[in-house]
């Protein structure tokens, strides 16, 4: 029986088809990425630059596997009659030759194209909805990574055990597709990274910010730099303003720009205005939201409060990246600075691939993309790539994609019921019996 099973696996199952997701990530984009960035392979190699780009994206989908296993399972290397397998060192050298710029170009190209797909289905009164937030990732503790990225400093001159990468992402609220991202050294503040992202925010949009980004320079440049670009942010407890119109629950306020901010950015005015909307959070605490949506008839205060409550769902995007895709790994794979950047752009591209499939499946099922389980979708895509034995004929690709989306929406996320009993903290069970001895007086 075991011999029959081996024969079935070896001879009957087709090789995994990486072109399975080529309907979303066309090969033309891969060629353009390596051509525009000057990373195209001149010599005939088993791992040309185009295949290495696929490899970087695949490594993010299969974080629990080594680079050699991913190469063999997905058959990314070109066939060679003399050498059957590609060594780990050859794959590492191929990644070094590629660099990070082609993968970054591919992410930016694909992210903009995917965010424009079905955008009409997710508009809020004519506006696209985005959210901006920051996160950190650990890297291997190598001299190069520690020198370039730096690490967190604690009290008493204590430094974190691992270097860290700090980044800020611009994510679509309805679909959680990452539209744009900026990453770099840990010592650079999120405010500076956010300033780099603001010019890339599209017109006719509303961006929901974490209150840590409350800055006149960021918010004023967002509203003035494009056409019909708006912001929504929670005010800090020490934010001071003067009410000029309306009521304290919903009115127009005027705030003074600090002299330090005007010194850094002379274009800023002395005062800037926003609409202040009072809301009550889940803990029954009064909060104030600041927004540039000043039309009270078109944008009611209840709508604005509901939009800001959706911002918290973006936190799950980082959890999906770090826990589900990275498998709770302590650090990234790469040990070089260029490799770290390359891996991050590849991971974001892979994450968007999964999120795009979820969005397509949600449209077919007429439900919200956030109602579809990311973990289930991620596991299904992994399984499909390996064992579905999809033919390489593009004629059968649409039926395969339809089958995938039907599986994704078969079990939607359910709202958890409220707590039925009081919360209790229990002692952690010990592996061995412990006898406690009382101290003698």
Residue ranges of each PLM-predicted region?
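Major-groove recognition helix of helix-turn-helix-like DNA-binding domains
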Residues: 81-100
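Short glycine- and Lys/Arg-enriched binding-loop motifs that mark or flank ligand-binding interfaces
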Residues: 85, 122, 208
